[in-house]
């Protein structure tokens, strides 16, 4: 406990950066590193420290150091589910490099590093004649984020294929393998906490035909191009409530095309928010708040956001009515959803019910 009840002093970030750089063999350490540039919104401030982790040994070293120092840790994946406050993130952001992106296929079993990109992995599995991961071609995130939030779309999700995940624990400093049951994957949720870092996973797919799986991927890509916008966005902003679609509810509440400052609700899909180049995270958050308010006023339904909100004042977020993932304010910045329920067409429909 600090003397006289004073809060602990802020870390000396440049000094910590030098200390980490001396301990790590193949990782880059940067002070005041822009996080917004690493997200698909392209808005937001800096992390006090960013470590681009280059080896498994460095990751273990960081986990041990973090367990002692009690850092506030943020893991940044592909940035496709991340909104960073304009004031930035008061902690250490981690980004796994391509050293954690390797994937290998043995029979119908696929082992992949946490930094592997889902669309790339989905296409590779289809080319190998394996089925079960085709839906992931439309989820622009990494494997690590997919596990943390049970990514899904088109009637399937990670729970359907995952067998285990190796997890580094930045609270204890250790690492161990979690079985599927331990991960407790639900609709866009899991048992993983902010101090857990996915390192590697194994998925069990099924034998299929290359032509069949590649045609499925072509149909999913075409469907998404018709029904979802491009631009600077993070995909689905809100999770679908049971039996309904967040996009339908937002549209019914008159939110399509709604704009606050530099952020606007897509005119293509009302569950997507797009940020202008050079815009602000506060505008995006204000627009999210307004959409949620209008939906609740119109339908009585309280939407749960899917976006990882980082660096915002947590009490203020709760005052705004956000009742989202446990990682509000310091979560895992990786894509977690491709939309489901009535939000997207199921695999059976895409295949003409040939399954």
Segments and roles (model prediction):
Residues 2-143, 147:
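Anion-binding (especially nucleotide phosphate/pyrophosphate-binding) glycine-rich loop
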Residues 4, 340-342, 349, 354:
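Low-complexity, intrinsically disordered or signal/transmembrane-proximal segments
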Residues 6, 318, 335, 351-353:
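Basic polycationic patches enriched in arginine
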Residues 16-20, 62-66, 215-220, 287-291:
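Short amphipathic alpha-helices in soluble, non-transmembrane regions
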Residues 30-31, 39, 43, 82, ...:
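Phosphate/pyrophosphate- and phosphate-bearing ligand-binding catalytic cores of soluble enzymes
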Residues 44-45, 49-56, 83-101, 148-180, ...:
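Structural signature of FAD isoalloxazine-binding scaffolds in flavoprotein oxidoreductases
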Residues 81-82, 122-125, 133-137, 147-157, ...:
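A generic local secondary-structure boundary/capping motif
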